[in-house]
Curated annotation (Swiss-Prot):
The organism of origin for this protein: Brucella melitensis biotype 1 (strain ATCC 23456 / CCUG 17765 / NCTC 10094 / 16M)
Pfam families hit by this protein: ABC_tran (PF00005), FtsX (PF02687), MacB_PCD (PF12704)
Entry superkingdom: Bacteria
Protein name: Macrolide export ATP-binding/permease protein MacB
Family listed: Belongs to the ABC transporter superfamily. Macrolide exporter (TC 3.A.1.122) family.
Length: 647
């Protein structure tokens, strides 16, 4: 017969290795098959016929020899080039049908066209037409489990024809069918041969083999006989390789199609998917909640510091190596007067504090007494409600008067009466209440700023505490940008006055910076603790994906047989992992925000911001990518023949 053969095998050998043991399955097979032939390769189990079919269909590569397909040396092609060749040239019909159980009949038929880059509308139309031609038009949306064996095999045949199927390789196509269904399948194969397809049937049954025009018998890896029963009829219009629409083809047409396949696979085992999602959901929601609470705590601390004023400088007595600064009697009211003369100083307020016993009627109560001067209100620490009673004259002498914080008022005046003008005993000394203080709530560190009684500085020093020195001087500056310079000037002034360094000076701006840094550290710590659960969720994703790869090995083989390249398989399984992580991340963000809102309702300070939410979702997405890569890579590295033979 004129013309070069479509398939030429020259001295093909195949050896399998099991440790140190080498088993040669094919021994120097030489064979020509021309375009349009209907060939049956017959042999008993273990004869090597399935191995020969795998090599013919580019599902496996020979150990030795040369395989020419349409004049091209197949043995020189890499894995992706072999995938392209399978997609453009071959259509496979398997004994066990090898349909994807999670897909409908129409979706199964569309698989080869997906990897060929055929537009969705066109491939759906062609798949429906093929199934209608095979009398399955009313079964388009049925899954394999809803079809009979004969119907499943017809779906398999339609899939083989989806990309043209220039060469049809049928492996035991009637082996799992009843006699009538088997007869129908053989008639379909004969019809495909008459339409110009090259049909190669692999079988162990002589009655099936004799339906072909040419019968090649193989035994123990060698061709035993090669006979032609009748003149080979080659159709005038021999089919050409399938022309792919998407350039080089062999890629998933778009990401949306890969996502659809991923979601379809995830729905197949919904319980396992939910368990996998839980790990990501818990991890992401923990990160969002912890960061929100941490940010809220940081903001609360900073707000309290801001309320105290960031333009304040605090001067306290202290000496290097001396513990207990409160007992150092070096800071005096005259130091405040000297500080007030500095250029950037707005006010300098000396203060003396100590614990005192208050009494009204039969109620005794211990509180904090604060002796200060009129400028005290300028420090913005407390304010008097009765400013008309806030006269400097009351500070200059040992006047027994004072202002009460709201906690003290509630304790000594539980009946709600107005304390102004009334008298109480402080350290057994009668004091007139001339005002109350604005409520301040908890201070920095959790102390109650309302548990205080304010008295004139001179009264506090001599009548209550019996001392002339002060505990601290609070300085308010005019220009906050010069606060560091002013702090240095105060330090130099006091060093000069005291002839030594016996004071400790801090400004609220630096305290705020330290508190902000501490808050950030705590937030990072909380986020890190929560991120551990996200890491555990990621390991769960990897574990489930590895199980999925093992369970779906045959599906991977089917996809590779129909033209999927390694990158297509890699992309599909990575997208499955990313889909789990993205869904879990979205649910986790919602639950995390809900948990944060619940914490806020319960009284905790919560700080919402877009950054932590985006970070948590991005971490979930990255977790899916990182932990999904290893299973995806494992899937993409499988050999088609090995994957198809898995149980």
């Amino acid at each position: 017969m004129a013309g070069a053969p479509l398939i030429r095998l020259e001295d093909i050998c195949k050896t399998f290795h099991n440790g140190d043991l080498a088993v040669e399955v094919l021994h120097g097979i030489t064979l020509d098959i021309r375009a349009g032939e209907f060939v049956a390769i017959m042999g008993a189990s273990g004869s090597g016929k399935s191995t020969l079919m795998n090599i013919l269909g580019c599902l496996d590569t020979p150990t030795g020899g040369r395989y020419l397909l349409d004049g091209e040396d197949v043995s020189t092609l890499n894995a992706d080039e072999l995938a392209t060749l399978r997609r453009r040239t071959f259509g496979f019909v398997f004994q066990s049908y090898n349909l994807i159980p999670t897909s409908t009949a129409q979706e199964n038929v569309e698989v080869p066209a997906i990897y060929a880059g055929t537009p969705a509308a066109e491939r759906r139309k062609r798949a429906a037409a093929l199934l209608n031609a095979l009398k399955l038009g009313d079964r388009l949306d049925h899954r394999p489990s809803q079809l009979s064996g004969g119907q499943q095999q017809r779906v398999s045949i339609a899939r083989a024809l989806m990309n043209g199927g220039r060469i049809i390789l049928a492996d035991e196509p009637t082996g799992a069918l009843d006699s009538q269904s088997g007869e129908d399948v053989m008639e379909l194969l004969r019809s495909m041969h008459q339409q110009g397809h090259t049909v190669i049937v692999i079988t162990h049954a002589r009655e099936v083999a004799e339906r072909a025009d040419r019968l090649i018998e193989i035994r123990d890896g060698q061709i035993l006989s090669d006979t032609t029963k009748r003149d080979i009829h080659t159709p005038e219009a021999t089919l050409q390789p399938h022309e792919e629409i998407a350039g080089n083809g062999a890629h998933i047409a778009d990401i949306s199609e890969a996502v659809k396949m991923a979601l379809r696979a995830l729905r197949a085992n919904i319980f396992r998917t939910v368990l996998t999602l839980l790990g990501i959901i818990i991890g992401v929601s923990s990160v969002v909640t912890m960061l929100a609470i941490g940010t809220g705590a940081q903001n609360t601390i900073l707000d309290r510091i801001n309320a105290m004023g960031t333009d304040l400088i605090l001067v306290r007595p202290a000496m290097a190596g001396f513990r207990g600064s409160g007992s150092i009697a070096t800071l005096v009211p005259q130091d405040a007067d000297a500080i007030l003369e500095l250029p950037n100083v707005k006010s300098a307020v000396p203060e003396v504090t100590g614990t005192v016993t208050l009494r009204r009627g039969n109620v005794d109560y211990q509180s904090q007494a604060n002796g200060t001067v009129p400028a005290f209100s300028l420090s913005e620490i407390v304010e008097s409600r009765q400013r008309q009673l806030h006269h400097p004259e009351r500070y200059r002498y040992l006047r027994p008067c004072g202002w009460l914080g709201t906690t003290v008022v509630k304790t000594l005046f539980p009946d709600g009466s107005n304390p102004v003008g009334d008298y109480i005993l402080i350290q057994k000394i009668p004091f007139q209440i001339i005002g109350t203080l604005e409520p301040k709530g908890a201070g920095f560190g959790g102390s109650d700023q309302d548990d205080v009684v304010v008295v004139p500085l001179s009264t506090g020093n001599l009548r209550l505490f019996g001392q002339k020195y002060v505990r601290s001087i609070t300085v308010q500056v005019k220009d906050s940008s010069l606060i560091d310079t002013t702090q240095n000037q105060i330090q130099s002034l006091l060093d000069q006055r005291h002839k030594k360094r016996d004071t400790m000076i801090t400004n609220m701006s630096s305290v705020r910076e330290d508190a902000a840094a501490m808050g950030k550290t705590m937030t990072v710590f909380l986020g890190s603790v929560a991120a551990i659960s996200l890491l555990v969720g990621g390991i769960g994703v990897m574990n489930i994906m590895l199980v999925s790869v093992t369970e779906r090995t045959r599906e991977i083989g089917v996809r590779m047989a129909t033209g999927a390249r390694r990158r297509d398989i890699l992309l599909q399984f990575i997208i499955e992992a990313l889909s789990v992580s993205a869904i879990g991340g979205a649910i986790g963000v919602i639950l995390g925000l809900g948990a944060a809102a619940l914490a806020s309702w319960a009284g905790l300070s919560v700080g919402y911001s877009f950054g932590p939410v985006l970070l948590a979702f991005a971490c979930a997405f990255a977790t899916g990518l990182i932990f999904g890569f290893l299973p995806a890579r494992k899937a993409s590295r499988l050999l088609p023949a090995v994957a198809l033979s898995s149980e």
